[in-house]
Structures are given as structure tokens and as C-alpha cells.
Amino acid sequence: MSHESHHSEGMATSGEVHEIREEEPEIETMHIENSVEGESGRQRTESTASVNSESWQNSDEMMMNMRRAQSLLDQGASCFQIIQQVFPEFDASRFENMSERVHFKVLSDLLERAPTRQKLFTYNSLSDAVDLFRTRKNILVLTGAGVSVSCGIPDFRSKDGIYARLRSEFPNLPDPTAMFDIRYFRDNPAPFYNFAREIFPGQFTPSVSHRFIKQLESSGRLLRNYTQNIDTLEHQTGIKRVVECHGSFSKCTCTSCGNQTDGMEIREDVLAMKVARCKICHGVIKPNIVFFGEDLGREFHRHVTEDKDKVDLIVVIGSSLKVRPVALIPHCVDKNVPQILINRESLPHYNADIELLGNCDDIVRDICYALGGSFAEMIASYDACVERSPSTSRAKRQLITQQEFLNICAQERRDKTPVPEPESSEPSTKRPRMSTTEDMEGNQFQQIQKHTSSEDDDEDNTRNSDEVLREIKHPRLISITDMLNDKKCVAISAYQTVFPGAECSFDMETLKLVHDVPHRNRHESDSSCESCSTVPGSDKSEANPLSRSQSTDDIVYAEIRRKEVFLDLQRCDSCDNDLQYELSDPIDPETFAKRIADMCIE
């Protein structure tokens, strides 16, 4: 379960762009002031600025863009003009008529995107991945919610994840991410405590993926496990070389008097969905989880600084890499360090050398079977003491080629094609049939009517409608998981191997993977997906959401919604719908140039 955090400082005032000239630092400050309609005159600031002054996050490309932006600002350019000149390949036309506040958000997001990583073409296949695990001695593993899903802990951004559920279960939340926003928590901790029991430690058993990481450590291969999760399952597994990037429930702190206690002291309150109170001052107790708006701390940055020059393999397991600064780790190492992604989906903003897509535990199982020895023994030991799903493969899956997969798809379609009725020699009294296309569209329209006529189960109807709409829009798309049984995986491209559980489809025409994007109406937001919304392997330069904003499309959607929906003061005090920008501690664009200056420090 991943949360973003970064240090924020500064204040904003009212709705114009100013330059504040100082003798020091040499780079002048950029000051953008915001005022938002519908807030009863109350001002607030919001920014994507999350680049910490720690040197490991520096990038020549990012620094060059930031300096160019600052230079243009000094010359009197607006944020929109800076976007056009610094990022000419970015289509900014859809933002042109939006507010300066939106322009600043887009500019900040573009400036803080990590540089595009170039794939190493030496490493591509599943067997290449196994060889890397076998030979590398300083493996850095970055884990997200995907490693804990099989333990019964929900992830955040999948279609059935925490954020999707929060929208329906807590309609008063201005945005699902507000539950982990420190300012919202201070004002109203009840929603967090209503939910916290679902992820409170002590209720779950570590997964195969956790034990795999422990086995890497035991065999002397693990450099460090950076986890974005707060479930403490790494400690339960016995992993020593772990950094809990976003904290955990192991300790708690009173928000009033600062008294610290053991996390288990609030167990009863959490399980009873009660707000835990301090025994000394009766203040609200907050678990030592890094909420949005809180700093990760020096220890995290110290470890990354030490590890980035030692690592010889990076493995990302079950993470969307959407929250900084953790998402920047794969981009701070030497360009020749191979990288593997194990996830349900491909990530449009991350070019891994090898992509293994599907349920994390299923993929890890196959890797362990291939490695053999203590890794295969670990799987056998795990299966002996943990109840597994009957569908879980007990042996290494059969790897099939793309052509073999296409043959399976072709056979499936032949089996489903109805046998045509024999033609009658007598003239027909019926009217002429429509064209095949018209007939198909008519049948599809009837299917939509059938699926949308009943409102007994909205969730099922939505899911069924999604499937029908996908068939109408993309009849050439095939669900890979539907075509694979649990005993097979497919090398769908040179560098992508797909296992059961992958949340993607296969385009029979382009022979590429396509991310499953659920249909939504105009009042729903895109909080789903633990990764991408584009075709892996296509040009990924435009989709690079590394901050809490999943994409610039969210900015457009939120700006339109802002004009359509009146938000009361309480809702305005926290996160905007879909934006997922830092709103917790006051921060304004004045900090923008200061961060540039900080990053310039060698």
C-alpha cells in the first residue's frame, strides 16, 4: 500500500504571477498565487512539487528543464508559455483556456517527471530474468501493494482496490486519497479509523513474494527491500534489510502531546473502528504511517544514496511507481543496471527491460521453480503450511509463444462461431437482411439494453456493460487471462511474458498488449489501475505519471468538474477529486525555484 510524501514549505496568497528578486540564491523565485472559486474567500495552495533536495534524485535532464523554466519565468513568460517552449512535444492545447493554477500544476508535473529510461536489449525473456536472479549479488527489490494482495490485503488502484471502494463506502470523502492526507486526518480522523482495521497487522500471513525476497536475502543476493507497504509483513517474514518507505503501524504517536506508544496498544480501537485517543491528553493517536504531506525522513534518503551505486539489478514487484520519491529510485541508478517489472500491468512511465505481467505470486513461483534448490524448497515448505487456492499451479507453467497463443485464440473463435443454416431454394418472404456490420451493431445494441435494463446489481451491471462496450469498440481485443489456463504463460512479445491475472488485453491486429480501461461516466474518476492506461511498447513519452497526479487527463477532468460541482468548505480543505496533488501543508510556487536551487547543490 503506497503513500507519497515529501517536504513542503512556503505560502501563497492571491491569483497572479509575481517575481520576487533576491540577492541569494542566484536562481530567482517563482511565485504563483491562487484563489479558488467556491471557497468563501479562503485561500489554499496546491502543487506537485515533491523533488527533495537529496542529491540522489538529481537528473541532468530534469535540471536543464527546470533552469530553462526559471529563465523563461524571469523573462516574464506565463506557465502556459513555459510549457509550450520547454516541452514542445507535449500537447498543451487542451489546457490553454484553463486557469493559471492548472497551468502551474501541469508545468510542475512535467518538470518533475523522471527522465525516460532506455531499455537494455540484452535482457528480454523470462529465462533472462531467471539468469539475473541466479547471478546478481546486489538486488534491490522495490515492492508495492501487489505483493500483499494474495494475503487478503487490498491494493489501492486496481479496479477493486481501496480507492475504488472508498468512493462508495465513504461518499463524504472529497477524494479517496484524502483518507491518507495529514491535514484531513487532523480535521476528521474517523474515516481512517473506519478503514484501518482492514490493513492492521497481525491478521495476515506473508505471501510467496515476501518469502522469495527473504530467500534472496538468505542466499546473499538482496541489497535492500524498499517497501511502500505499511502492513509490516516484511518484518513478519524475517527480512532484515528492509526500508519501510512509508512507515508502518508498529509505532504510534499522539498528535497533541507527541507521546509515542507501541502500535498494538491501539489494536482494540482499530478493530472496533474507534478513533484511538491518548491516555495522557486524550489527543488523537496517529500510527507512524507516512501520510500525504509528511516527509519520508533522512534514513530513507541515506539508504538510497548508499545503495544506488552498489545495485546490480532492480526488481519492481506489485507497484504502480506513481508516488514520489520512491518512484524515482529506478531512475537514479546507472543506466546499465538491468531492471525487471513484476506486476499485473505494464507501466507507461517505466521502461523495464523485462516485464512479467500477472499475479505477483504466480510469477514468483515460476521463478523459484526455475531457480531450483532452496527457492524450490521454499515453495514446497510454503505450500505445506499455507492453504492455497485450488487453481494455484504446483509446477512450473508451460511457456508458449505468441504464435501458439494466436492459434489458441483462433481455435476459441472457431468454437464459438455458430454454424450457418442451410440455404433454402424457395424465395424468402422476409425482408432483406441488413449488412453484417449493421446486424452486428443491432445485436450489440440489444446486448447493451439487456445488460443495462436491470438495476438490481449496479456493480455487476457496470462490469457487464464494460465488457459489451469493449467488444463493440474493440472486437479484435482478446483477454489473455481468459485464453490461458493456470498451467500456461505466454511470451507475448520480445520482452513481455504474460501470466494468469494480468489486467490487459491483446490486440489481434497490432499484436500488442492493451491495458484494460473500465468504462466510466463523466462523474466517476480514474482511481483504478495499479499501473498504465496505454499500450505498452508504444510511445510512452507523453504518459509519465510519477506524482500523485496519475495523468494530465486528471487535471482536465478535475478542472471541468470544478466548474460543474459546488464543493463545500470542508471538501475544499482537502484533496481535489482525481488530482492527488499535495494539499496537506501549505506550499506555493515560491518554493519552486528554491527547490531548483537546492537540487543544484552538489
Swiss-Prot record:
State the free-text cofactor note.
Binds 1 zinc ion per subunit.
Q: How does it assemble?
A: Interacts with ftt-2 and par-5. Interacts with daf-16 following heat-shock, which causes daf-16 to accumulate in the nucleus. Interaction with daf-16 is promoted by ftt-2.
Where are the stretches annotated Disordered?
25-57, 411-468, 520-551
- Family the entry assigns: Belongs to the sirtuin family. Class I subfamily.
- Report the protein name in the record: NAD-dependent protein deacetylase sir-2.1
Source species, please? Caenorhabditis briggsae
According to the UniProt record, what class of enzyme is this?
transferase
Write out the annotated subcellular location.
Nucleus
Cited InterPro entries: DHS-like_NAD/FAD-binding_dom, NAD-dep_sirtuin_deacylases, Sirtuin, Sirtuin_cat_small_dom_sf, Ssirtuin_cat_dom
* Bias kind Polar residues: ranges: 46-57
Q: Which reaction does it catalyse?
A: N(6)-acetyl-L-lysyl-[protein] + NAD(+) + H2O = 2''-O-acetyl-ADP-D-ribose + nicotinamide + L-lysyl-[protein]
Q: What Pfam families does this protein map onto?
A: SIR2 (PF02146)
What does the record give as EC number?
Answer: 2.3.1.286
A GO biological-process term: negative regulation of DNA-templated transcription
Matching entries from PANTHER family are given as:
NAD-DEPENDENT PROTEIN DEACETYLASE SIRTUIN-1, NAD-DEPENDENT PROTEIN DEACYLASE SIRTUIN-5, MITOCHONDRIAL-RELATED
Task: Tell me which PROSITE patterns the record gives.
Answer: SIRTUIN
Q: Which cofactor does it need?
A: Zn(2+)
Q: Which UniProt keywords apply?
A: Metal-binding, NAD, Nucleus, Transferase, Zinc
State the Gene Ontology terms under molecular function: histone deacetylase activity, NAD-dependent; histone H4K deacetylase activity; metal ion binding; NAD+ binding; p53 binding; transcription corepressor activity
Where is this protein chiefly located? nucleus
Q: What is this protein for, i.e. what is its function?
A: NAD-dependent deacetylase. Required for a reduction of the 'Lys-16' acetylation of histone H4 (H4K16ac) on dosage-compensated X chromosomes in hermaphrodites. Functions upstream of daf-16 in the insulin-like signaling pathway, promoting daf-16 mediated transcriptional activation and increased life-span. May also regulate life-span independently of daf-16 by modulating the transcription of genes involved in the stress response of the endoplasmic reticulum (ER). Acts upstream of the nicotinic acid metabolism pathway, which may be linked to the regulation of longevity.
Any idea which positions bind NAD(+)? Answer: 144-163, 228-231, 318-320, 343-345, 360
Write down the Gene3D superfamilies for this protein, in alphabetical order: SIR2/SIRT2 'Small Domain, TPP-binding domain
Q: Which residues form the Deacetylase sirtuin-type domain?
A: 119-374
Supply the gene name: sir-2.1
Q: Where does Zn(2+) bind?
A: 254, 257, 278, 281
